[in-house]
């Protein structure tokens, strides 16, 4: 097998799949999702909750504020958008 045929198959790396809540849907085809991380303090052992907001591509504009969504990492779609909406787990009440 030559090297050219081996290199033609591009490997997709492991994509991070996260679950979060939509906090904004005011942009076209973009939602802002808040992700939560829980870490334990190295010395004191207290659980610390940190949140981060990421911009997510929503092609069909189906997600609304308050929805619980599953997102996955993808190639950069813009300067700040690196995630894609996979599914809506729970609609807002």
Curated annotation (Swiss-Prot):
A GO cellular-component term linked to this record: cytosolic small ribosomal subunit
Keyword annotations from UniProtKB, A to Z: Ribonucleoprotein, Ribosomal protein, RNA-binding, rRNA-binding
PROSITE patterns: RIBOSOMAL_S17
UniProt-listed SUPFAM superfamilies: Nucleic acid-binding proteins
GO molecular function, one term: structural constituent of ribosome
Keyword Lyase: no
GO terms for biological process, alphabetical: translation
Transmembrane segments: none
InterPro entries to which the protein is assigned, alphabetical: NA-bd_OB-fold, Ribosomal_uS17, Ribosomal_uS17_bact/chlr, Ribosomal_uS17_CS
Coiled coil (residue ranges): none
rRNA-binding found in the keyword field: yes
Residues in the signal sequence: none
Highest taxon above the source species: Bacteria
Family to which the UniProt record says this protein belongs: Belongs to the universal ribosomal protein uS17 family.
Subunit (UniProt): Part of the 30S ribosomal subunit.
Function, in words: One of the primary rRNA binding proteins, it binds specifically to the 5'-end of 16S ribosomal RNA.
Name of the protein: Small ribosomal subunit protein uS17
